[in-house]
Amino acid sequence: MNVIQNLLSAVSPQPDGDFVDKLNYCATTIGLVLASAFITGWSFVGSPIDCWFPAYYKGWWAEYALDYCYVQNTFFVPFSEDKAERSYNWEQLVADKQNTTSLKQTNQIGYYQWVPFILALQAMLFYFPVVIWRLFYGMAGQNVTSLCNTCTATEGNEESRKGTITTIAGYISQKRHRNLIVKQLSGFQNRANGSAVITSYLFMKALFLINVLFQFVLLKRMLGVDSYFWGAEVTSDLWSGNEWPETGNFPRVTMCEYEVRNLDNIHKHSVQCVLMINMFNEKIFVALWWWLCFLTVVTITNTIYWFWRASGTSVSKNFIRPYVEDIDPKVKNNRGKLQQFVSEFLSPDTVFILRLIELNNGKTPVVELIRDMWRRFNTAVPPPYSAPPLLVKDGAPLLKNFQDESEM
């Protein structure tokens, strides 16, 4: 139980992504872990399989057959088929080797032993993208989780909050700011574009999308179904009142056959078994299939949305502009200054981190961070078009420059 608690705490939501990220790596992972733990517990505590044995099966013989039928695959024979009715004498059915082999291959049930492991594997696949994302932004030198948590902690003392905001603002803008100063002093045109963090985030989004689509392939192969839309088909059958005896969907009653060597002779045996575990497997996997459908839609939409957000400076400017206009209303008459602030002073990573802070902490810390960075920008970067006037008479310029006109 402690292992499960530690695992669930490890996948708890962190403020380094949006709501869809948390649906993928947190909600889905926790649900799969709980389902895997439940099936595992039922396999040990309950009776995942029970078989009907003839009267001459005694003690260890019945135990051996029961264990064998659980670890080996069983096969389903619909009671509604004519062959099943003619073959109610199972010894006669087993004697017909060719028909039995074909029947086993067609209706083989081989997933119930592996359900806990498959669910655990699915949980790891859903958590893997966020591990890559956190590894990459750590390598880029921007601990996004710590930044967002620090913004949450600034809601206390006013003086302490201002100091923390100043530190965060300097931290997330220092790389682009230093590159901008180098450009102005030395004339170098090449500088780091500061997009490592957002590129890593988009890569995580792509991994989430690939993973959720791969889940349909994984379930199809594991359950041995013919269609990727099996979840809808099972739901339709249940809604229409067609239960597993007719459809074969997660059958509760299957056949198991095995061989026993007695001296030089090999005796074949066939028994009928009840897969109680399939009663739970049906509910779990049908619910999982519908959840994956929902997750696919929201993940595709969310991934497209974030790629659009990272598409260019104009999108970033539309995000920054309302904040800057509230801080400095004069910028409404000087769009060039705002453009320079967004395109040269703020890196794509800085704008992205501000978006995450807004998503996880609200607008208040974002306003304070942008106010501090706007102050740094005005201090470090000279105004555009600030050359001396060309014509002067009696110490006064005959033609005011563009910057002077914009400040009037």
From Swiss-Prot:
The keyword Cell membrane applies. It holds the Pfam family Innexin. The chain crosses the membrane at residues 29-49, 113-133, 197-217, 284-304. The keyword Transmembrane applies. This is Innexin-12. Glycans are attached at residue 99. Belongs to the pannexin family. Disulfide bonds: none annotated. GO terms for molecular function: gap junction channel activity; gap junction hemi-channel activity. It is found in: Cell membrane; Cell junction, Gap junction. One of its GO terms (biological process) is positive regulation of nematode male tail tip morphogenesis. It comes from the Eukaryota. GO terms for cellular component: gap junction; plasma membrane. Coiled coil: none annotated. Disruption phenotype: RNAi-mediated knockdown causes defective oocyte transit through the spermatheca. Calcium oscillations triggered during ovulation are random resulting in uncoordinated spermatheca constrictions. Oocytes enter the spermatheca normally but change direction several times before returning into the gonad or proceeding into the uterus. RNAi-mediated knockdown disrupts tail tip morphogenesis resulting in retention of the pointed larval tail tip in adult males (also known as the Lep phenotype). It is a multi-pass membrane protein. Its main location: membrane. InterPro entries: Innexin. Structural component of the gap junctions. Plays a role in oocyte directional transit in the spermatheca during ovulation by facilitating the directional propagation of the calcium signal in the spermatheca. Plays a role in male tail tip morphogenesis. Keywords: Cell junction, Cell membrane, Gap junction, Glycoprotein, Ion channel, Ion transport, Membrane, Transmembrane, Transmembrane helix, Transport.
